[in-house]
Amino acid sequence: MKAIVYTSYGSPDVLRLKEVEKPEPKENEILVRVRAASVNRTDCANLRAKPFIMRFTMGLFKPKKKIPGTEFAGDVVKVGQAVDTFKVGDKVFGFDDSVLSSYAEYLVFPANKGIATMPRDFNYQQAGACIEGAHYAYNFINKVELRKGQKVLVNGASGSIGTAAVQLLKHFGA
């Protein structure tokens, strides 16, 4: 399969298109044919490994995972033996900020992590680009004791996290 690969940190110039081995799902994973993947702020930070502290989890001198990408949408093409939440043919989207390897034709993903069935009215491009902001916004909102009718100021509501926060807060009644 084809994938975007990097073996050192840096600018987008370090990215290369290469043939790599197609992954196989373990018993609790699914294999997804990637139809759309975005480039978001997490991907840019991972590519450069900045701030430097990121290198303690991503690889001190070079990336541990050679295929970048954190966000995707696609089709389930194979499921591990222990997976009962997804089936072949499901349209799914997901996000993992620890480098998911979504810049490839196929990826494996744990069935019990940040993955869901796509809403019917979403296309692959919409689903593949909407998750990162919502992931962080939901995480922040979930940490506060939000009450229905409470007024909330979202500082920076024009980016992906802020716009997702506004929508989620409205959904939760703030």
Where are these regions (language model features)?
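Extended, non-globular alpha-helical segments
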Residues: R35-V39, K113-V144
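A structural motif shared across PLP-dependent enzymes of the aminotransferase-like
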Residues: S98-A111
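Mid-domain Rossmann-like dinucleotide-binding core that forms the NAD(H)/NADP(H) cofactor-binding site
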Residues: G128-A174
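Short N-terminal binding/cap micro-motifs at the start of the first secondary-structure element
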Residues: G10-L17, R41-T42
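Terminal peptide-recognition signature
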Residues: A3, V34, V76, L107, ...
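Glycine-rich beta-strand-centered segment in the early N-terminal region that forms part
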Residues: E21-S38, F52-V99
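Short Gly/aromatic-enriched secondary-structure transition segments
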Residues: C44-M54
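Nucleotide donor/acceptor-binding cores
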Residues: M1, D90, R147-K151
